[in-house]
Structures are given as structure tokens and as C-alpha cells.
Amino acid sequence: KLTKYLKKGMAVLLTATFCMGLSAGLTGCGKDTTKEDSKDIDTFRIMIAPYQDADTLLTGLEPLGGMIKDELAAQGYNVGNVEITVGTSYSAVGEALSAGTADAGFISGGTYVTYDDDCDVLLTAQRKAINKDSLNAKDWNDGTEEAFTDNLTTYYRSIILAGPSTKGQELAAKVNAGQKLTWDDLNGATWAVMGASSASGYIYPSLWLYNNYGKQISDLANVVQSDSYTTSMSRLAAGQVDVIVGFAHMRAKYAANWMSKFGGTD
């Protein structure tokens, strides 16, 4: 179980001191793709940011098309088809919204800020909180499993996780001993990050590095970009990278897949 592994393996390296407001859940493009006053829509195109692998996202979102058609019908709109796709990157979704090749999208707050000249927020989301919310990394490494609570939250933290590789465990041991990591410690690790418009997967960790070391993710010697957090977790489990960055509830979200899907060790 991942619970056991949390006690000795996949430690939280650092908890970035940034809390981010939840993403602009549903964003509409600023360009009108139907005739004025028309309530007939042949295809309503929704693009999703790739925070998980495309297959998982599309399976989970399968009921969404029918729900949107029903809701729009109640508002007097006749929608022929709802097309749901997953973008190749966070920026790709923002670009599609800006260009009008997507009518609406589920994006991060960071992506919205980048493309807000052409997009408007339609809905924002809340999510379930988790039972840990500390700025002290050792509190996340106390051997107890992160779990979702019944409370809703309007923010979440960005964290940096160390994996089972030799370097990852070296960094985790230093943090758990109460020692401050140096820039050389961090620069000697291989990092997996998300695209540059991802809030928890790039922007906030980069700001944390700047505030603490005067450096950014772009200054790290060994960085690979993942197409989803699922890919980052898989790379971490396989020891292909030493460190990943992402949202604070990553371990709770991916616990069931750590060994069965990602090949992580107990």
C-alpha cells in the first residue's frame, strides 16, 4: 500500500508557501462562433486541460456532454453535439479558447491569467479539502496518509515531492532531519514539471525557488516536462525523475495507482 510507502519512501520535499485560488473551472472564449440571437448550435466544443491522462479524463467526463445539452436546452438552446477533447498542454487549451477553436474549456487559474484578454470566466470550482495543510514539510512526512475530507476549499497548495530514487531519498532524508536544502541539492536532482502556464505544476514552484534561492525552474540543470500529472507520478515511481511538482493532494489522488498502475514500490 502507498500508506506504508509514505512512511519510508515518497516523502514531501518542501511545501511551497503559495496557496492558489482554485482554477477558473469553466471558461468561455471571447469570440462568438454562432450567429447573433441564434439558439441552434451544431457542435459545442469543450477542451479540458491535461491534468490527468486523456483516457482517464474522457472516461470520467463521459456524462458531461448529455448534462450540458440538457441544461442548455432548458435555457432555450438546441445543441446537436457536445464535443469534449483533452488539450495537449495547458497552453494549448488557452490558445484554442483564444482562437475560437474551442467554445469553452476547463483550465487552471494560471492559464486564465495568460489568456484572459480573449476568455471570460463562466464558473469557478470548489474541491474537497485534504487533512493536511501545513507549511512544514515534516508534517506531511509523519507517516499518516493524506485523505480527502468532507469540507470544501477555495484554494490548494503546491508541493514538491521526492521519489524513491537515490537522489530523491537523499533529499527527503535531509528535509526530515530538519536541514535546509541548498540550491546545489535541488539542482542536482532531475525534476518533472508541467507546462509553464500550470499554476501548481510550474508557476508556484518557480516562485518558491525564486523567493528562497533567487532561481527559477528554468535555472535547474535537469528538467523534463510532463504532459499530465499522471505521467509525472509514473516517472517518479519508476525512478526516472527524483522530484516532481504539483497540487497538494497528489498523493491522496494517486494512492490507489502507485503500485498497480505506476509500478511504485511498497
Q: Positions of the model-derived regions?
A:
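Short, polar/charged alpha-helical segment
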Residues: 46-47, 53-80, 207
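Pocket-lining segment of extracytoplasmic ligand-binding domains
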Residues: 187-266
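Short, well-ordered beta-strand elements
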Residues: 36-57, 81-86, 188-193
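A conserved helix-loop-strand patch within extracytoplasmic ligand-binding domains
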Residues: 127-198
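Bacterial signal peptide processing site
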Residues: 30-32
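Short helices/loops that flank or line small-molecule/ion binding pockets
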Residues: 77, 83-105, 110-118, 228-259
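C-terminal motif of bacterial Sec signal peptides marking the signal peptidase cleavage site
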Residues: 21-28
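Ligand-binding "clamshell"
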Residues: 42, 114-149, 254-266
